């Protein structure tokens, strides 16, 4: 099972993507959802995931900034 986190500032989007992934039964499991890149970074500091699905435009930390953090600190994600 591959672990996934979903990062989006809109709850309906997070919920929809998570439900879709979890209901597809294709080997992916959503292990966390976050409304901002800063929340996702806090999670990633303590946990490893296989895939991050992120919005680009978010209030505090954008998806671009999150991608930069992942590139520098978790390149296997």
Predicted regions and their residues:
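His-Asp phosphorelay/catalytic-motif detector in bacterial-type signaling
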Residues: 2, 48-50, 74-77
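Two-component/phosphorelay signaling modules centered on CheY-like receiver
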Residues: 11-32
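Acidic, metal-coordinating helix/loop segments flanking the phosphotransfer/catalytic sites
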Residues: 18, 33-51
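Acidic catalytic/metal-coordinating carboxylates
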Residues: 36, 61-66
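Receiver (REC) domain active-site loop signature in two-component systems and cognate sites
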Residues: 58
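Short amphipathic alpha-helix used as the core "switch/output" element in two-component signaling
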Residues: 42, 64-76
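Conserved acidic carboxylate
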Residues: 8
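Active-site T/S-Asp motif of two-component receiver
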Residues: 5, 54-55
